[in-house]
């Protein structure tokens, strides 16, 4: 849809202040005044509904801020609830922790906890946390015994980053987590919202069906799958194929053409 950019003021609208919070408005002060195209498209569903969402968009297109919109909605609508942010790698977990230390802990006064193989907080820290950033394996282990861990039943939002890795080694763990959280929601009669973040997907409809996402046309649809062309920084792709069954001879065959391709397409820019 060709929508005008949503202003930052939408997080604390003067005419309907109950729809937001003043601290939400201050969260992005000095960073931007308008949300980008991807965030604008998904804003209403993320911030003004409790629908499950699948957001597929290229790297660097603002998916993290989109996830933050869902987190802000959870803080507003479910005070005392917990937000779980699941990232596939410890490095990504650490990146989120460093980014949110000031943004969410200082500005919003939320308690943030890291849960990975390197960091295992005690029970008191987990019970007092508003946001738990973790790897799939750690949350799988924690949530298995959910009946004995009351804080698991307080989860109101689960954000799964890089959910397209469902088809990789960690796929079965993500499947178990989603199924278990939906089961917990049914048993406790407390809604648990699931937001999946991904690159652009070829089978977005299948993944949306599995997540229980509404796909109807209109502003409340929970499926957003953007083309690579929506990147803020355009990306050109040039693909050359080389036959070869064995790795070393194939690499040797590709050496000179790779150098020639760099000289042709990126003669004055860094190359890796």
Residue ranges with predicted function:
Residues 44-51, 64-79, 179-184:
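Walker A/P-loop NTP-binding motif
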Residues 64-65, 82-102, 140, 199-203:
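Conserved Walker A/P-loop ATP-binding site and its immediately adjacent core
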Residues 72-95, 185-191:
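Conserved SF1/SF2 helicase motif Ia
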Residues 118-133:
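Conserved motor-coupling elements within RecA-like helicase/translocase cores
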Residues 193-272:
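Conserved interdomain linker/interface between the two RecA-like ATPase lobes of SF2 helicase motors
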